[in-house]
Amino acid sequence: MGEPARWQRRVEEFVLGQIGDSPTRVLEVGCGEGELALALARAGHSVTAIDPRAPEGPIFRRARIEEFTDPGQFDHVVASLSLHHVEDLSMALDNIADLLRPGGTLIVVEFAWDRIDEAMAEWALDRLPAASPSEKPSWLGRCCRGWTRGGEGGSHYHGDDAEAHFAGWAGEEGLHNSRQVRAELERHLVERHFEWVPYLYPDLGDGVSESDESAAIESGTINATGFRYVGTRRALAEP
């Protein structure tokens, strides 16, 4: 199993661990190609998966979370790498809170691009697989190689600082940063679980594992750029 597949398996394990074994009603926001939604359905849950480009299939609907409606409420809402993409984050979380039953949970897996500093970018750059003309480079490869130019003797020349470079990329992509995402989560829900986790290793070379990135995080060499969050819907009387 390659690292991208292992990362997806970790996400599935985390989400299923939060949901439990009893069949529940689950909404996935930003389902992409549908791997996680299908895994949840195979586990016995009643799944509705939305995305503006959702695939065909009975559990999938092409919709944006800001406008999505449903006649019922959900036991769980799952958002894996989708909240930083939504156009109106506050509106999206307003709707998610309304779609959750009282006591229902929002389960989030997210990317904190704003925690990529120079040390993080250098660490990733040194571990990127060699560029191949026959393969489309990953987002990380494009960003890191766009930040640096080869210098004499194999040295690197950086046109700007890493934070500014990645902020420029995120601005072009319309991405929210992790501080914005966490602030809106705090405003709409009650936090039950939060942890920083490795995120970059699936896009690095074959020899770089989750444990390698974890060790670099634990030693203070690099920042963690992934996080997991679980929150419950606020009671109507709560501020």
Residue spans for each PLM region:
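A conserved beta-strand element that flanks and buttresses the S-adenosyl-L-methionine
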Residues: 78
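Conserved class I S-adenosyl-L-methionine
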Residues: 24-32, 107-142, 150
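A short glycine-rich, Lys/Arg-flanked "PGG" loop and its adjoining helix->strand segment in the class I
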Residues: 91-102
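C-terminal lobe and adjacent flexible extensions of AdoMet/dcAdoMet transferase-like proteins
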Residues: 188-239
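Class I SAM-dependent methyltransferase SAM/SAH-binding core
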Residues: 32-67
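Substrate-binding/catalytic lobe of Class I Rossmann-like enzymes that use SAM or dcSAM, i.e.
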Residues: 137-207
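Conserved alpha-helix/loop element of class I SAM-dependent methyltransferases that forms part
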Residues: 5-22
